[in-house]
Regions:
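Outer-membrane beta-barrel translocator/receptor signature
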Residues: 105-107, 119, 128-137, 142-225, ...
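Gram-negative outer-membrane beta-barrel transporters
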Residues: 527-530, 650-652, 669-857, 926-930
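Periplasmic-side early beta-strands and strand-to-turn transitions of outer-membrane beta-barrels
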Residues: 154, 161-163, 169-171, 187-285, ...
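A surface-exposed, glycine/aromatic-enriched loop/edge motif typical of exported proteins
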Residues: 239, 243-318, 373-396, 449-486, ...
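Structural signature of Gram-negative outer-membrane beta-barrels, strongest in the C-terminal barrel
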Residues: 230-232, 429-432, 438, 442-446, ...
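Acidic, small-polar-rich N-terminal luminal/periplasmic segments of exported/outer-membrane proteins
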Residues: 29-163, 631
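C-terminal beta-signal and adjacent terminal beta-strands/loops
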Residues: 31, 456-459, 463, 701, ...
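Membrane-embedded beta-barrel scaffold of Gram-negative outer-membrane proteins
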Residues: 351-357, 361-367, 373-377, 582, ...
Length: 931
């Protein structure tokens, strides 16, 4: 479908070409925008693809500062950052990046100057000195270097020219925001050699208040610079070199506020009081609405791995967060540690175009990028009000943890970091023959290497490690005050990854991808053209597995062997076929009709490392496939003063990749789905100086029949015949949840053995062995007959059909895909007032609304995210003769704080929810000068 409103209206330059017509009419012709969506320059209205394009002026006019703002101007698009390092979900028509892990590919390919960016800064950096930002909707693998089942975002930088030009912009806004942008273009040898230098910086105060220490966090301190060199030694040979650097060092919050409907644990089970055993029967948080007052509770620490171990070893007694609630203000947090965010990247590109003849052009495009990210923040987002018990390990309730520091509070920190390197080499041959047959073919080699580290560091984990140093095998050399000589405890302030007193999910990952792709065009006549595109892709993925087992052997636990290194190969042929036709309808000036069938593909991958034997985890996940049908029309009407474009689409999706967190790791699964919808985009200039625009997107998604998945937030599906129990430290999945028969649990409680329930989660035989093991050896010390009865004769492990110790799978049939609102709409209007002295004033307003959606495939009330809207207004004064522009703006006029996405953690973390919110009201004033 066609141009977005912003795509065609450029505010800092004349947006319309006036035609000679009677003064009474005073209508205007909307300026034509040239794009390269098909790797060649074409008028946007002539491109048979659903594409929205934005010039730098358009981005500025609509206050689209970066990738997250694009959703407010494009139908059927949603955007949210993810929970982990340098990750985000840009979703088009329900397809995005819901799989989590180093080997998971984006469903929407992000490109810079047509080169794929596996790890980019789309959600961190801001747009500056760009020629265009193009967003293509639908599968695009036959022309773009990395497969993209959902679409493509292509950021095209402004290139050096043979004319001197420069501009500078200084902006000041609320939150003490200072934003500077500038560019200078310097021709050196006429049209043969030129250099273009551009840059941007942003420094502002934070949006969030940490009420624990009164610090303002989630600030920004970042900059980016870009240098390009154009060298065209001949008319036939044209080259361009680019270097771009990005740097950030601030307190950006990787996640938003943490919500939890506290689970206090049941007072009774089967009519039997639980007493102190209730601490082993809580899952931390319950699946309540994120908008209910109860959602501002705190995690029951007994439902977490760290709290479970603290209770078992006596450092804590139940919920360390008892009585704690959080502020109902989504921009207030309470954490012992302020967030830290550091990011650096360098990108290098070299593009060569050589005209082999007047009708044949060869293109070589080389791209290399390298980057690193380091982030840390408080994991539980609340300061526990109850101190540690006073024990030999915690004298006076205090403990000096090597990573957390000296405190008497239950404290957990997560550190997410990574470094990456990528290289791509693409060759392309494109024809422009006079005859009916033309082509655009190419090949790409792409390599990507990354090492991601995700740590969860807790003083309760270190305390448990020390306790186990003295248990069973005994290690009297372990010093509980200094942690010196304690087996498996990392004494470094910055974790090295060698200790087992913290959780470290370390993933070295390598991707090697090769592909041949291209399209052939047959022009039957001047109005009708057929297109055939094919792509052959081969992906090779490898992950080196590291043990993620906490509390390793040598001090009390049995270590399952680490899973072997994983390798996977995926090979697939995809393509598209269709036609476009320029129709003469009589009532339009120009009409383009098009229809295409395409097959999209995204490779499968390898789930992040887990200990062998962990419950319910597959080592790999399968590829995605989509069969897509799209029909559309692009129309120019009313003597060029109206653009009206429409697209309808239907997708048959096989293997849509989704993720959930199980046993402290991301587990990616596949589901089938149907997707259909339509999009409308229109621009109208009824009179001179007035422009109106509107977009409407409708999206319907439906998961296929027979699809099911265990919902870790509700493992029993609310069936009272079963009870959730925490998994004890004897299992590789320690801290997770299991499901046991309620009658059996009640019998165990009635026998006074409720404290042994966590050891039941590995089955009857292991439970019986624990019960009968002497207490001095770490067991319960019960008589053999009693142990046999409790493990085998209580019905503890009796399950109906479909149930298991993991729970029962929820039926997903007919559910909606996550982050897929039914409706996305936007409207805009601007009017330019001509003032005296060569000045003009342009007033513009934009409004966007998104209907409700679900954060997960389970579509429960807990998953429901409410509809939200946003309004922006700008006022700009121009004096072209001076090259001066002064503008003022307000973004998010209503200062609303919508929840735009939510992340559910795993059972061992208490099933809390990190929510992602939009920016608050922002306003400011700026002055620009161009030369």
């Amino acid at each position: 479908m066609g141009a977005s409103a912003a795509a065609i209206s450029a505010l800092a330059v004349p947006a319309f070409a006036q035609q000679a017509r009677p003064a009474a009419q005073q209508t205007t012709v909307i300026e034509e925008l040239v794009v390269t969506a098909q790797k060649k320059e074409e008028a946007l209205q002539d491109v048979p693809i659903a594409v929205s394009a934005f010039s730098q002026d358009s981005l500025q006019a609509q206050k689209i500062d970066g990738g997250p703002n694009l959703q407010q101007a494009i139908p059927n698009v949603s955007f949210a950052r993810s929970n982990f390092t340098n990750s985000f979900n840009f979703q088009i028509r329900g397809i995005g990046a819901k799989a989590v892990g180093a080997s998971a590919d984006q469903g929407v390919g992000v490109h810079m100057n047509n080169a794929p960016q596996q790890s980019g800064n789309l959600f961190e950096s801001e747009f500056y000195d760009v020629e265009r930002v193009e967003v293509l909707r639908g599968p695009q693998g036959t022309l773009y270097g990395r497969n993209a089942t959902g679409g493509v975002v292509n950021v095209i930088t402004a290139k050096p020219t043979d004319q001197f030009e420069a501009n500078a912009r200084a902006e000041y806004g609320n939150y003490n925001a200072i934003r500077l942008r500038g560019m200078v273009n310097m021709p050196i040898l006429g049209d043969k050699l030129a250099v273009r230098v551009a840059g941007t910086m942003l420094k502002r105060d934070g949006f969030v208040t940490n009420t624990f220490n009164n610090h303002v966090v989630d600030d920004r301190d970042l900059y980016s610079t870009r240098v390009q060199v154009m060298f065209n030694p001949t008319e036939k040979l044209r080259t361009n070199f680019l270097w771009e650097r990005f740097h950030e060092d601030d307190s950006r919050a990787r996640t938003g506020k943490q919500l939890c409907t506290k689970d206090p644990g049941p007072a009774t089970v089967g009519g039997v009081p639980t007493g102190a055993a209730a601490r082993y029967l809580t899952q931390g948080c319950l699946p309540g609405s994120l908008y209910a007052p109860a959602a501002y509770g705190s995690v029951n620490t007994s439902g977490t791995l760290t709290g479970l171990l603290g209770n078992i070893f006596g450092f804590t007694s139940g919920d360390s967060n008892a009585g704690a609630t959080t502020s109902t203000n989504l921009r207030e947090i309470e954490t012992a540690l302020d967030p830290l965010y550091q990011s650096n990247s360098n990108t290098y590109q070299f593009t060569l175009n050589y005209d082999l003849s007047d009708a044949l052009t060869f293109t070589a495009m080389t791209s290399y990028g390298k980057g690193s990210v380091y982030t840390s923040q408080d994991y539980n987002r609340v300061v526990s009000p109850i101190p540690f018990n006073s024990t030999p390990f915690t004298p006076g309730g205090f403990f000096n943890d090597p990573q957390v520091g000296n405190t008497n509070k239950f404290t957990t920190i997560d550190v997410s970091s990574g470094r990456s390197e990528q290289f791509s080499q693409e060759f392309r041959l494109q024809s422009a023959f006079d005859g009916p047959l033309n082509f655009n073919v190419g090949g790409i080699h792409f390599t990507y290497r990354t090492l991601t580290d995700y740590y969860v560091i807790g003083n309760s984990l270190t305390l448990s490690s020390m306790a186990l140093n003295f248990q069973k095998t005994g290690n009297p050399a372990c010093n509980p005050s200094t942690t010196a000589n304690c087996i498996g405890i990392d004494t470094s302030a910055t974790p090295t990854g060698d200790g087992h007193n913290y959780y470290d999910n370390r993933t070295p990952y390598t991707l090697v991808s090769d592909a041949l792709f291209g399209e052939v065009y047959y022009q039957v006549n001047e109005d009708l053209k057929f297109t055939l595109g094919l792509r052959q892709t081969r992906d090779k993925k490898a992950v080196k597995n590291y043990s993620t087992v906490l509390l390793a052997p040598g001090y009390g636990l049995t270590l399952n062997p680490t899973n072997p290194d994983q390798r996977a190969r995926f090979t697939e042929t995809t393509g598209r076929v269709g036609f476009d036709y320029k129709a003469n309808l009589g009532f339009t000036d120009d009409t383009l009709l098009y229809a295409f069938y395409s097959k999209g593909y995204k490779g499968g991958g390898i789930n992040p490392g887990v200990p062998a034997g962990a419950i319910g985890i597959s080592q790999t996940f399968a590829p995605e496939f989509v069969n897509a049908i799209e029909i559309g029309t692009k129309n120019t009407l009313a003597d060029g003063s109206v653009l009206l474009n429409a697209t309808g689409f239907r997708y048959d999706y096989k293997g849509y990749q989704i993720s959930k967190i199980v046993n402290r790791t991301s587990v990616n699964e596949n589901v089938d789905a149907k997707i259909w919808g339509f999009e409308l985009e229109s621009i109208w200039s009824p009179v001179r100086n007035l422009k109106l625009n509107a977009t409407v997107g409708y999206l319907n998604t439906k998961i296929g029949d027979g699809v099911s998945s265990i919902d870790t937030m509700n493992r029993t599906q609310s069936n009272p015949a079963y009870t959730v129990v925490k998994v004890g430290p004897q299992a590789s999945s320690v801290g997770a949840n299991c499901v046991l028969n309620t009658v059996g649990v009640a019998t165990i409680l009635g026998a006074g053995a409720g404290a042994t329930l966590p050891w039941a989660c590995t089955g009857a035989a292991a439970y019986q062995a624990f019960l009968s093991t002497p207490a001095a050896a770490g067991g319960a010390g019960l008589p053999a007959a009693t142990a046999a009865f409790l493990a085998n004769s209580t019905g503890l492990f009796n399950y109906a059909n479909g149930f298991s110790i993991e729970g029962v799978a929820a039926n997903l049939s007919g559910n909606e895909l996550p982050n897929s609102p039914h409706w996305t709409t936007s409207v805009g209007a601007q009017y330019t007032f001509e003032l005296s002295g060569g000045w003009s004033a342009t007033l513009r307003g934009d409004y966007y609304r998104q209907s409700q959606q679900f954060a997960r495939v389970y579509n429960t009330e807990y998953d429901r995210l409410k509809a939200w809207d946003n309004g922006n207004i700008t006022l700009k004064f121009d004096k072209p003769d001076w090259g001066v522009t002064i503008d003022a703006y307000v973004k998010n006029i209503g200062n609303k704080i919508p929840i735009i996405d939510a992340y559910t953690t795993d059972d061992s973390s208490g099933l809390f929810t990190n929510v992602i919110t939009a920016e608050p009201r922002l306003y400011g004033i700026a002055i620009s000068k161009s030369w």
